[in-house]
């Protein structure tokens, strides 16, 4: 399970999820990627479930890159406790994902296997996604 080794503050503000992702919007390492179409918090358990679904389908072949990390803690108060009296205890870890962010990348497997593995991973996540293919940049290398 992915969790930070140490954090400066145990409790964080919730923040807002407006707009598109600043970075990580293109497939950088692998051949195929799973891109978020909407914004959401993704927990460390959901990331792990998606990773297991992909690697099991690929039969341990190929390589998987996880491009999101759950660095933000979320809190909740116990059931039956009245409002106020401070912020609740840290409950778990989430990764805030904005629109356009590539969450997972795959390489080293055929296209049909990669697409099915990413589809299975998408079912484990609470966000609408699309599968994107790496775009080759430029035609020929500059020769000098």
Swiss-Prot record:
Swiss-Prot/TrEMBL keywords: Ribonucleoprotein, Ribosomal protein, RNA-binding, rRNA-binding, tRNA-binding
Gene Ontology MF annotations: rRNA binding; structural constituent of ribosome; tRNA binding
Cited CDD domains: Ribosomal_L16_L10e (cd01433)
GO biological process: translation
Functional description taken from the UniProt entry: Binds 23S rRNA and is also seen to make contacts with the A and possibly P site tRNAs.
UniProt record similarity statement: Belongs to the universal ribosomal protein uL16 family.
NCBIfam families: rplP_bact
Known partners and oligomeric status: Part of the 50S ribosomal subunit.
Name of this chain's protein: Large ribosomal subunit protein uL16
Gene: rplP
